[in-house]
């Protein structure tokens, strides 16, 4: 291998190590939500990623007895606590969010800023032809929280996204859609 190719490989390796090192969240608690529409079920998938500097605060909220172990009961309680900070309505009617799935990473991953808490909430619906307005609000988890929210492209060809509106911080989201 020529000296030029070796140099190029060294630069690529160095750039790769920088990009992976900078991928860790630092001082924010990212709460990213995707919304998946279907006529009989609306799914909200939250991916919660505490940064290195806020991980201890988040862990204290989850690990209620402070023993350094996140039990299934503590994980479930935290998921329900997150749900209390969410509001969801369809055409002005508030609908309950039901916890369907929750997965928690290892504590070491959370402390490193790479661990993602995954929560899936379902809303049972029986949507018919017509126009719909969905409103979603995430009250978050404190001043270090940042939000992202987006709707996935529907699998059902009769569902049509008409428009999405977000607040500047994306804690508030509105979606207009149509079923034909």
Residue locations for each model-derived region?
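Positively charged n-region of N-terminal signal peptides that target proteins for export
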Residues: 1-6
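Bacterial N-terminal signal peptides
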Residues: 7-17
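N-terminal soluble domains immediately following signal/targeting peptides that reside
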Residues: 22-180
